[in-house]
From Swiss-Prot:
The gene is sdhd-b. The keyword Ribonucleoprotein does not apply. It is found in: Mitochondrion inner membrane. This is Succinate dehydrogenase [ubiquinone] cytochrome b small subunit B, mitochondrial. It comes from Xenopus laevis. Keywords: Electron transport, Heme, Iron, Membrane, Metal-binding, Mitochondrion, Mitochondrion inner membrane, Transit peptide, Transmembrane, Transmembrane helix, Transport, Tricarboxylic acid cycle.
């Protein structure tokens, strides 16, 4: 809704005569609101909240781990060993934990269900890491096991 007003009725008499033409103005724009409208600023930058830095760092860490896995998997094939086995165990467990954490965030609703799902996720991740470390220590290790599977 707009009303047709003369700008000169909103301005003082000492303003330039160029403002005497007819313009379409919104109804709430009265003389006392004109100063506020002229001086209001629009900020297009996003608001920075206290937790946004932590979320950004978490996202960066997830992406860094994903990129590191792209190099770690071929390196594990070329240079198998205990250090590579334990690095794979930690990286794969953390990558899986973060991925399943996003599934829990997206698809589990309700306060109690979320707490149970997160507790289960931490337990699953801890058991996965412990199992991979046990396999690395007491058996052939991840790298050699994958090589043995490929040789079948």
């Amino acid at each position: 809704m707009a009303t047709l007003l003369r700008v000169s009725s909103l301005c003082r008499a000492n303003r330039a005569s160029a403002f005497k033409s007819l313009l379409i103005r919104p109804l709430p724009c009265l003389s006392q609101d004109l100063h506020m409208v002229q001086t209001s600023q629009i900020h297009t930058s996003p608001n920075h909240h206290a937790g946004s830095k932590a979320a950004s760092m978490h996202w960066t860490g997830e992406r860094a781990l994903s990129v590191a896995l792209l190099g770690l998997l071929p390196a594990a094939y070329l240079y198998p060993g205990a250090a590579m086995d334990y690095s794979l165990a930690a990286a794969l467990t953390l990558h899986g934990h973060w991925g399943l954490g996003q599934v829990v965030t997206d698809y589990v609703h309700g306060e109690t269900k979320i707490k149970m799902a997160n507790t289960s996720l931490f337990a699953l991740s801890a058991l996965t890491f412990a199992g991979l470390c046990y396999f690395n220590y007491h058996d052939v290790g991840i790298c050699k096991a994958v090589a043995m599977l490929w040789s079948l």
